[in-house]
Design a protein with these regions (language model features):
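Residue-level detector of conserved catalytic or cofactor/ligand-binding positions
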Residues: 112-122
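Short, acidic/small-residue loops that bind anionic groups at enzyme active sites
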Residues: 101-113
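N-terminal beta1-alpha1-beta2 submodule of the flavodoxin-like/Rossmannoid cofactor-binding fold
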Residues: 1-104
Length: 122
């Protein structure tokens, strides 16, 4: 099983990365392979609604980190998205990233529930 952890912070090794690394370590203790994917610090455009991803192109017409993620995500069993919180919401780049990834990724990005282990009660 593989879980892709997405760092939506413009700071590759900041607080969001630390939180994702902690989550990754817990998953790895359960035998889950993890990979942290940083969206980077370059601007990420929002969806322009052209529909190219649905009309045979098979990916977003805006060629950036979103297409790279969708390819990796198609092979993953689950995702964890981490983002700094700005004014009670995720950052703009992360919002645009997720909108485009889930739309252009189509069925490969559909919700798939996974179960890792039984919770323990104390």
């Amino acid at each position: 099983m593989t879980v892709l952890l997405v760092n939506g912070s413009p700071h590759e090794h900041g607080c969001t990365d630390a939180a994702l690394k902690h989550a990754a370590s817990v998953l790895e203790e359960q035998g889950v392979h993890t990979e942290i994917f940083w969206i980077g610090s370059k601007p990420i455009s929002g969806c322009i609604g052209c529909g190219a991803c649905k009309k045979g192109l098979g990916k977003c017409c805006i060629d950036d980190v979103v297409n790279e993620f969708v390819l990796k995500a198609a092979e993953a069993d689950g995702y964890i998205f981490g983002s700094p919180v700005h004014y009670a919401a995720i950052g703009g780049a992360m919002g645009a990233f997720m909108d485009r990834a889930f739309y252009s990724g189509g069925k490969s990005m559909a919700l798939s529930l996974i179960h890792i282990s039984e919770p323990t009660r104390h």
